[in-house]
A protein has these predicted regions:
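A short, surface-exposed helix-loop junction/capping segment
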Residues: 1-7
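Charged/polar, solvent-exposed surface patches and flexible loops
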Residues: 21, 96, 100
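Intrinsic disorder
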Residues: 10-13, 85
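Short beta-strand
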Residues: 33-36
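Amphipathic alpha-helical segments
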Residues: 12-30
Length: 144
């Protein structure tokens, strides 16, 4: 089965604009787009929480998406496996995920910081997930 949005023709900048609109409508106070060689490589934003302002960096790994497209192309030559297409697909998937999360937020089942907790950045720009992965933070055992 091919990955979601593998046929998208929507320009990355249009998708980034849609993401920015979703985030700003739901409380983002600042949004920054990162680029490398003219390609969007990251999107960070700030939200206000009960503990103060928090920075969040969304995950995007176009190289990994490209590898998935290349692997899937072996079984389906209709799949376009270029870096440009992988970048479009990656950001479209992120946009769809954010859109779904904002729908859950609107039902008041969750708070913004719950949705983006793994992507909250520390003062060095490292996300909570990255710190966890490097064993810099551990969850306490509840059996103690």
């Amino acid at each position: 089965m091919a990955i979601k949005n593998y046929t998208t023709t929507i320009n990355v900048n249009k998708t980034i604009g849609e993401i920015q609109e979703l985030l700003s409508k739901h409380g983002a106070t600042a949004i920054m787009t990162e680029y490398s060689n003219g390609n969007v490589t990251g999107l960070s934003f700030k939200i206000m929480t009960s503990k103060g302002e928090v920075g969040i960096r969304l995950p995007s790994n176009t190289d990994r998406v490209l590898q998935v497209l290349k692997n899937q192309r072996k079984n389906n030559n209709q799949i376009k496996d270029t870096f440009d297409q992988a970048n479009k697909v990656a950001w479209r998937i992120i946009k769809d995920w954010i859109d779904a999360q904002m729908a859950i937020l609107e039902t008041e089942m969750v708070e913004m910081e719950q949705i983006f907790l793994p992507y909250v950045m520390n003062n060095k720009g490292q996300t909570l997930y990255e710190s966890f992965k490097e064993n810099r933070i551990l969850l306490e055992d509840s059996n103690d």
